[in-house]
Amino acid sequence: MIDVRKYIDNAALKPHLSEKEIEEFVLKSEELGIYAVCVNPYHVKLASSIAKKVKVCCVIGFPLGLNKTSVKVKEAVEAVRDGAQELDIVWNLSAFKSEKYDFVVEELKEIFRETPSAVHKVIVETPYLNEEEIKKAVEICIEAGADFIKTSTGFAPRGTTLEEVRLIKSSAKGRIKVKASGGIRDLETAISMIEAGADRIGTSSGISIAEEFLKRHLI
């Protein structure tokens, strides 16, 4: 049996969420045994002050990834200082599409160097990439030294597909972990993504997924 809860990065990234809602979100995620919560930089200090077991993840350059490198670095450093243990970094998709691969790698390396204690996940936005670009994205993330390649911000025109997760997994050959994100809203989809090779699941439906898992397995 796959304990889906241990794969979930439960996201609370909508701009209208109040601090009270973030607090309740963190407490509920922890109560359900969810692995991590993922929040915006403004909410990291609050989430970290509440979290006891659940990991705290922060998005960087979210959701477009087109901030200047210096801004991303500062954002990442401050997030870790505020208590973030993991960083989900949106890479510069425009630079990648422009084949400025050295720039993409160096930007990521600079962020990683300044936040050595963090787990680094790079969001590459697979819904905008073809098969060859996805393979290239895997190699760039590995070269930069990322811990995970993450499929999507969830802000793309569609969600992540099982085929994309399988392609990343087969291309990675065990050299980098995979976080599937985008359109994962129920337990069945989460399980399918894990079976396809996802090591982590990014979703804003983590609470309902965890509750359904517990209901089915009477834990």
From Swiss-Prot:
Cross-referenced Pfam families: DeoC
Superkingdom, taxonomy of origin: Bacteria
Entry EC number(s): 4.1.2.4
A GO-annotated cellular component: cytoplasm
Record pathway: Carbohydrate degradation; 2-deoxy-D-ribose 1-phosphate degradation; D-glyceraldehyde 3-phosphate and acetaldehyde from 2-deoxy-alpha-D-ribose 1-phosphate: step 2/2
Gene3D superfamilies referenced in this protein's UniProt entry, alphabetically: Aldolase class I
Residues annotated as catalytic: D88 (proton donor/acceptor), K150 (schiff-base intermediate with acetaldehyde), K179 (proton donor/acceptor)
GO process terms (BP): 2-deoxyribose 1-phosphate catabolic process; carbohydrate catabolic process; deoxyribonucleotide catabolic process
InterPro entries registered for this protein in UniProt: Aldolase_TIM (IPR013785), DeoC (IPR011343), DeoC/FbaB/LacD_aldolase (IPR002915), DeoC_typeI (IPR028581)
Family matches, as CDD domains: DeoC
Keyword Nuclease in annotation: no
The reaction(s) this protein catalyses: 2-deoxy-D-ribose 5-phosphate = D-glyceraldehyde 3-phosphate + acetaldehyde
GO molecular function: deoxyribose-phosphate aldolase activity
Location of this chain's protein in the cell: Cytoplasm
Record has Cytoplasm as a keyword: yes
UniProt keywords, alphabetically: Cytoplasm, Lyase, Schiff base
Enzyme class: lyase
UniProt similarity note: Belongs to the DeoC/FbaB aldolase family. DeoC type 1 subfamily.
PANTHER family the UniProt entry points to: DEOXYRIBOSE-PHOSPHATE ALDOLASE
Chain's role: Catalyzes a reversible aldol reaction between acetaldehyde and D-glyceraldehyde 3-phosphate to generate 2-deoxy-D-ribose 5-phosphate.
Protein name per the record: Deoxyribose-phosphate aldolase
Originating species: Aquifex aeolicus (strain VF5)
Taxonomic classification: Bacteria, Pseudomonadati, Aquificota, Aquificia, Aquificales
Gene: deoC
